[in-house]
Amino acid sequence: MRSALAEVPSVRRPVRRAVRRWAATVSAGLLAAALISGCGGDEPYVAPTQVPSTDDLQPAAAATTLDALQRALRRDDADAASALGADDQMSALLGSIVESTTAAGLDDVTLRYITENGQVSPDGAWTATVAATWRVGGFEERAAHADVAFAFADDGKRIAHIGGGADVTPVWLGGTTDVRRTDDVVVIAATGTLPVASVLAEAQEALVVARRVLGARADRLVVEVPSSAAAMDAALGIDRGSYAGVAAITTGADGSTVPGRPVHVFLNPEVYGDLEPVPAQVVMSHEAVHALTDAPASGAEAWLLEGFADYVALRDVDLPRSRTAGQIAEQVRRDGVPDTLPTRADLDSQAPHVGAAYEAAWLVCVTLAEHFGEDALVRFYDAALGGADLERTLRGQLGWTIADLTAAWQDELISISTVGG
């Protein structure tokens, strides 16, 4: 889910179980004996080293290590967490994770060993899948759930790495972060990405913008900033490159769209960071509407979800229609008026004219608000979020059919294309 002003250049993959063969070392003594006896022309005897096997792993010890990390996180004990690191770098990261979870107010943090994934290194370290849960205390009632890859060393007594592979890598576990928390906004940003103070201010302004239309339900917002576009894909558990050109995505904190799960805004620093202040604020406000109304878990029409979010975000922005609807106006001048309202395929991030489609969806909601008022638009949106039949709701609440709405919207498109022509 993205804003019309966020330009687009536009289930979990199975883990590959790898079996590695390690080169054997040659016994110097045996080789010397062979040379002395005049057998140097034959292949020397090679004494194989022991190949690490999953039979040698210590999952019980790893589970105990996870329990210790979980206690450290719950007790805000950075020193105890650092002691679990396999090296200085990992020790520092584990300590910083404790500090970040404390600053963000994460609650219900659990880490449970599930199974090894078959990747064993020569020194006996291995990677396993760990079930993690967490929620932002005071903001969310239900916890997020994700499978996260942990690498263990020293017979499971130390943690060597967190994240990677096909599992989810939550931002708060994937590296050092900068955190800001107020009464209504939490920002968790990978260190060195976007200025946390600026993101916090934009998120707070997004609540103000949303409250003008949504009222008191525009109460709290959680924003996460992964270290890169690839890290955003990892945080959501999706294929690499899925949202490379997208400024922001709103979805479950664990990448899922399960109803009731915490919903967060994720910013792509490689795109969002290049936006000018006004477009950046529009994007943040747009995504905030999705989060505040739990839109990702809704089965409502995409044009309504995206169009309404842009309606709220652009409502009080002083931008001309040539800017907010310039792409769809040009498309109408070139190809004529679309026959139907924007489809989900039109609004897909990889669609060829997705920018124009978002503008078109916004104009559908503008059309409804201009004919029936903003309160009527909000009631219609809420009914659709609740699963109501769109045609029946439109007729019952507003006295229109989808055909009536489409015709009025087409008139709006003709009007803006003429003005811009």
Please name every model-derived segment.
Residues 2-30, 203, 277-280:
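N-terminal export and membrane-targeting signals
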Residues 35-38:
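C-terminal motif of bacterial Sec signal peptides marking the signal peptidase cleavage site
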Residues 40-71, 75:
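Short, low-complexity N-terminal intrinsically disordered segments enriched in polar/charged residues
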Residues 42-43, 134-177:
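Short beta-strand edge/turn micro-motifs at domain boundaries
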Residues 77-121:
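Short solvent-exposed beta->alpha transition segments
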Residues 122-134:
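A short hydrophobic beta-strand element
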Residues 181-301, 331, 390:
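Juxtacatalytic substrate-recognition/specificity segment
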Residues 252-257, 278-279, 295-421:
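Acidic/His/Gly-enriched intrinsically disordered linker/tail segments
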